[in-house]
Amino acid sequence: MIDKSIPLVDLHRHLDGNVRVQTIWELGHQHGIALPAQSLAELAPFVQIQGKENSLVAFLKKLDWMVAVLADLDAVKRVAYENVADAALSGLDYAELRFSPYYMAMNHNLPIEGVVEAVIDGVNAGLKDHAVKINLIGIMSRSFGQEKCLLELEGLLAHKDKLVAMDLAGDELGFPGDLFNDHFKRVRDAGLAITAHAGEAAGSESMWQAIQTLGATRIGHGVNAIHDPKLMEYLVKHKIGIESCPTSNLHTSTVDNYDVHPLRTFLDAGVLIGLNTDDPGVSNIDIAHEYRVVKSEMGFSDAQLAQLQRNGVEMAFMSDSDRKALYAAKA
């Protein structure tokens, strides 16, 4: 199912959406934070999807618990370290971990730049102990408005040499991309690549804006592109990568079930699309789960799965020499 000769990657993976249940429990008790359960077993349903619950509101509540326990920078560093460990344990050769420093900082008024530094330190510590390659993507969380995003941007750009890209995430309908044109001009001026969550809650116009104005060369989710033939042609012609997260799309009710997920439409059209986990801690999945469901629920062949795997490597924000090294390590 997973082709061992091709590097296994996960490019759309939120570091702040992957906090272990055990870690939430321990940090909550360590810092006197009231948790919604009296035992570790009882806590799991509050922070992880159980079974087939598909509700955006429920999903976001679970996500919020993951940052509610980040009471100090040591907690941030621990979560970053464990993200590297989890990536390695799930068999990934390469992952891009993205994080929103304001979202991680806001519950306990942590310094935004301090959060960025703690994430970098935790990832570096993790890389010393685990055989996986990691790059970092900074997120501006649009839901908190332009000013908070500017604070995030400044904290992230202070360490731009430790990042490969910047992302725009959050409430796509309430805070359209046009509000962040100036923010992304600074990102482009800093020489960072750009990805953006778009075409998930909003339509294809959100994707056009992200690509043509913000400068995105990859799009997170992008499920609504299939309703715009001109956009589909553009995606193929310009090799705009689509970071697909099927299980997450189900859990957030972006799609009703795997049968109607547009992954196959994208692949058949020749769009550069790959599989990702999104918030693996909340969805309670790993990358192998995504390949399994695409095969079992969506009927993809092993050849199609291998194409998705190759696409992921091609889309990665890395140099051609690093890409070749990833393949060489699989030989």
From Swiss-Prot:
**EC number(s) given by UniProt:** 3.5.4.4
Q: Could you tell me what reaction this enzyme catalyses?
A: adenosine + H2O + H(+) = inosine + NH4(+); 2'-deoxyadenosine + H2O + H(+) = 2'-deoxyinosine + NH4(+)
Where along the sequence does the record put site: Important for catalytic activity?
A: H221
Annotated Zn(2+) binding lies at: H12, H14, H197, D278
Per UniProt, the keywords (alphabetical) are: Hydrolase, Metal-binding, Nucleotide metabolism, Zinc
The record places the active site at: E200
Cellular component per GO?
Answer: cytosol
InterPro entries in UniProt: A_deaminase, A_deaminase_dom, Ado/ade_deaminase, Metal_Hydrolase
- What's this chain's function? Catalyzes the hydrolytic deamination of adenosine and 2-deoxyadenosine.
Q: What is this protein called?
A: Adenosine deaminase
